[in-house]
Amino acid sequence: METQKKRWGDRKDGRLMRELDSLHYVTGILYPNRCDNEAYISQRIDLTNMNAYIAKKNETETEFPYTMFHLVLAALMKTITLRPKLNRFIVNSNFYQRNEVSASFVVKKQFSDKGAEALAFLHCKDEYTLSDIHDYIRRQVTECRSDKVDPSTGAMDILNRIPRFVSKAAIHLLMWLDKHGWVPADIIATDPYYSSVVISNLGSIKLKCGYHHLTNWGTCSLFCIIGEKAVRPIYAPDGTMAMKETLDLGLTIDERLADGYYYSKSVRLLKHLLEHPEELEKPMKEEVIYE
């Protein structure tokens, strides 16, 4: 992303939007809480092309095979890069444009009731392609499944060990710092709610698609749920029907950031990328013709 000189009012993670139209300026003040402005979008993806694409990629990639999750994450990164309003956030009633495109997700160290979890965080660059995202996820998953504790989990572990009244006071202080963008970077280095998008792959644990709430903590304004894939009827424009394997996505957005048309066009881009996965081999910043 293009970097700009920091000005008064900017945060370390975002640039203050100084030329907003009056409607959006007032909206941020009238409706200050992110959780009060959640909206939900569902999208069904035809997996025909994606399944064939993944099978071909894995003919040569056997150590860490490509999966549907890798493609969804890469498609979200490209969509956010090309549709920058998705990468805005509102804190303290002010609109900000995030300085980078990022994603976060939880890695289960072991699939069991008592299996610990770790936080993975991906920083995307304009020149990244699907291959770069795949390698980045490989490194993150390997690190998360080791004995190493990620920075944000480490900070929470400390709060959990000290007396309860002290930890509550510390958390209230952090919430005040969060409002002004002053939370120490080490504490939120892997905090998922400071990313462009949080992704939860419910399909990996045999759950259908749903929606996840946003939070007033942090800056994340987009949450994506990946459901379990299933064979469902797909209707062509001429009315004919075929049974195909599909994937449902559930998106939770902050409706204050853009109008419905902008979100609609963004979701159509996401759908196009997932149903034409070869587009993900191009750099994130390269434009895509999709309508």
Segments from the language model and where they lie:
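C-terminal catalytic/motor cores of large multi-domain enzyme assemblies
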Residues: M1-E291
